[in-house]
């Protein structure tokens, strides 16, 4: 239990909600959040290094070129969640991610296009029960991404992605991270 709490705290204190503009890191968060569908976040955090190794340290160009042989190899690899649909979707999503980069100049710019003021939203919640699972921005972005062919990226996963990458600041009012983000 302590190691789990330690891993969560380190992620919360050092990464979660920290503004990300780098497309490689955004792709990493997209992959990890998608992998989490139906699972606990701690499961994915524990396997994060495995995901980095399995998916070329989130080099989107290399991931997009992965083959059926790579998929079969990953189905035997304990470093990630061995779910064929999720592995396939990671490769598919990489190809679509690249298409968005070409269309918008970067995935960061694409993501920001769903925010009317072109900047992060800072919410002022006092309790966890106030934090929503989705938002109008996550609804619109996930709808657009699904239309483009992305898999495992519904509005709830999209909202978690937006939180993780700092597009939505949902640190509670009494959280020390609130002031530094």
Roles of regions detected by a PLM:
Residues 1-2:
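Short, small-residue-biased leader/transition segments that mark boundaries at the very start
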Residues 10-13:
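A short, charged helix-loop
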Residues 26-43:
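Short, aromatic/basic-rich helix-turn unit that serves as a nucleic-acid recognition element
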Residues 31-35, 52, 72-75, 91, ...:
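Amphipathic alpha-helical segments within well-ordered protein domains
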Residues 41, 45-54, 86-94:
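Non-catalytic DNA-binding core/recognition domains of DNA-processing enzymes
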Residues 57-134:
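Alpha-helical ds-nucleic-acid-binding substructure associated with the helix-hairpin-helix region
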Residues 111-132, 136-181:
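Catalytic DNA-binding helix-loop module of base-excision-repair DNA glycosylases/AP lyases
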